[in-house]
Amino acid sequence: PVPRPLTRRALLRGAVVLGAATATGALAGPVGGVAAPAPAHAAVPGFPTFRYLGQPLDRSALRYNPTHALIFPSVRYVAGRVEDPLGRWYMYYAPHDAPGGICLAYADSVTGPWREHPANPIIPRTWAGFDVSHVSSPDAFWNPADRRIYLFFHGENHTTRVASSADGRSFTYHNRVVGTYMLPGVSETSYARVFPHPTQSGVYVMLLMGNPGGTRKIYVGWTHSVTSGWQLQPELHLAPAAGEGGQVSGAHYWSRNGGGHVVYHAGSGNIHVARVGTGFDREDHLGVLYDSGSAAPDHGRAAAPSFVEVDGRLHMFYE
């Protein structure tokens, strides 16, 4: 049967907590004081198998949590990179529904405990010349060339913006970098993640979600400047395949296994992997990387994965 089209809210249902998982063989202990891991989930051959660890943040203890829904974690190592770091690791996240707001948590270990930044939201919905219903889906990109963190986020859903900071806490707004005006017939351009091009020096790549006619796909953009000159090509996209629930979003570039892979979530509720090549000109759907459990805490949905590697162990944060 043809999958029933999902609304953006349906695609985001269940996005009420941030989870953490680690590849099999990693530390099997609590994260942020949460319970021990459940059994590991099967993965695509050649890719790691992840085991659920826990929730890095306790929603009930957060000072800023207007919607009781936290999405799109972006975890970055900041020690020795940003000015006066609060911890060795920063995690950016956000509520989605209005008013949203980009938030920060910090920790000395990737496994926690994670602490909420007392000044959250560090980027509100009304700020630096724009006034929108919400801002959300933060992605942090540390640029060694100028030693600044560039934070990409959306607000409204048709616009992706960028701000930068030397300390990762106080940001300067630059401008919008991507919008639906760049993709005819597409109604959303959001949930972006940015990374250096795997083979071309001085080129940056963006993976983002676009919504042409109710079927969300992953599009590719590129630029020579982090804050401007972004280009999107409608023909370069990753569309949902059979078994993916008719929708895809939340893409992360997978540089391991020789690179050229994209990890993303689908309307099926699982996290999938596809081979796109280092030229982003292929589309080979490989299967499920992480199969969300039907019971708590996943409740049949895992999404927006963010990966960090520490001492040979790969950790996945997700919503």
What are these model-predicted stretches?
Residues 4-21, 40-319:
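Carbohydrate-active catalytic/glycan-binding domains of CAZyme proteins
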